[in-house]
């Protein structure tokens, strides 16, 4: 079977989004151009890394090339949900990020998880030997929007415990900082024994 490389040179949207309740969410990246939609599945940490690195790349591009980039506190333009139905093309394994100076674009490449070992030379390579890929070219504004939206999507999950910073679950939380006990409970005593003393 031949390799599929989905290229979006001028996407209408490139966004991160989720499906599911906090604590049980699936994370997706979606590239859209007119009626063409490609969705890929990935881990929350991958979204976080991509958003962080994209922000750092924009700062480096501005520093080295003088290219105008939107400020970090820019307002988010695209708050619409993912396009549905979500048909997953593949699960993301390797990710690549770069700057195309000629096009003044951030280049994002997402490679499918593969049973075959590949080195980083397959990133941005069009040869038939490699995993399926999605390659997206983003303007600095689109890249900043992606980064900002991704941060908001990640932050919309479960709130962190104020003591141990682990995510709080709706059914409760056993905090390692309190050795598994809840405040107000006496250790090793039933409520009746505690009231008698």
Regions found by a protein language model. Give the residues of each.
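Positively charged, low-complexity terminal tracts
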Residues: 1-197
């Amino acid at each position: 079977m031949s390799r599929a490389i989905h290229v979006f040179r001028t996407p209408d949207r490139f966004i991160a989004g989720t499906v599911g309740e906090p604590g049980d969410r699936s994370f997706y990246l979606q590239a859209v151009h007119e009626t063409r939609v490609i969705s890929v599945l990935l881990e929350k940490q991958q979204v976080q890394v991509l958003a962080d690195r994209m922000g750092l790349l924009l700062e480096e591009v501005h520093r080295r090339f003088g290219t105008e980039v939107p400020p970090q506190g820019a307002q988010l333009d695209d708050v619409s949900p993912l396009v549905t139905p979500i048909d997953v093309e593949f699960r993301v394994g390797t990710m690549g990020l770069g700057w195309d100076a000629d096009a003044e674009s951030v280049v994002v490449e997402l490679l499918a998880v593969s049973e075959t070992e590949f080195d980083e030379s397959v990133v941005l390579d069009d040869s038939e030997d490699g995993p399926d890929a999605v390659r997206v070219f983003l303007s600095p504004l689109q890249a900043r929007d992606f980064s900002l939206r991704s941060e908001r999507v990640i932050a919309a999950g479960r709130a962190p415990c104020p003591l141990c910073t682990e995510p709080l679950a709706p059914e409760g939380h056993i905090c390692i900082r309190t050795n598994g006990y809840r405040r107000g409970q006496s250790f090793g005593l039933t409520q009746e024994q505690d009231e008698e003393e």
